[in-house]
Amino acid sequence: MATPNPATGLGAIATGQLSVVGHALPWAIAVAFFFLAGGYLSFGTQVLIWILFALSLDLALGYAGIVTLGQAAFFGFGAYAAGLFAIHVSSDPILGHLIAVAVTALFGLVTGALILHTTGVTFLMLTLAIVSVMFEYANQATKLTGGDDGLQGVNIAPLFGLFEFTMFGQTAYLYALVVLFIWFVIAWRVVSSPFGRSLDGIRQNPRRMRAIGTPVWWRLLAIYTLSAAMAGSAGALSTHATRFVGLSVLSLFTSGIVAVILILGGIRRLYGAFVGATIYLLVQDWSAKVSPYFWEFIVGLMLIATVLFLEGGLMDLGRVMRSVLGRIRKADSK
């Protein structure tokens, strides 16, 4: 998929070229949703979690060109780490979250060091193998993970000892929103830095970057580890919000969903994860009420249309519409 010019249309969000109002708008909407959502806060929390998960994939795939099918391995690792820590060590959500992020980052560092020496189909198959092995291990290790029944009995203490994680979802939503904002700022600073620009060079031409002395492997390992930590954070948020870890967090289907979300929203856009996750989950929620399988058909059509007509995902919709309207005006003037 070709990369649209980030300086045009909504793509400017990704490179910090929008006004302060433009940057603040998505966050203002998220805050307003907290007050207006009513009984949909739990749904909103899931949207925030998937945004963070998609953002983690965007760092690896979009900005560094690391094509992976195994992002669910880090999401699931973080989810199980947070759940097991809450059961066996401490139910404090912040401490559990930090531990989950740390161990997932370490897992990403180790696996990245092993597989980033490879490229192309070999690398893709290795990421596939990692998530498949983890899924099977979690399925078989019933005493540790609960197997197919999932990890149950995860009790989460009140946040700061004051705010309970209730069924209404207020605490979980605000907690997820703050965590997402912190990670977004980190991601934005990374992609806007000289390090981020070097990743863009590596994505386009790794041989040339090596020729000018760039430590390509080390930089890929660094962004791969950061991507893993971010995905692990999303997994930990999922555990804290639902107090349950299902085996599906390690499934290939989960890796596929996050890839679809990113493609729908727009790769290398940062805010593309926001658009993609919101649209995907809204369509899923709406169409699933009509038929349990109908939503997959709708999402499939959206994905095909996005790939064919919107090179930059739904984030590119405004630019495409302006282009079409411009052509219509020119045709009318003739």
Predicted feature locations:
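Transmembrane alpha-helices and adjacent helix-loop boundaries
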Residues: 1-334
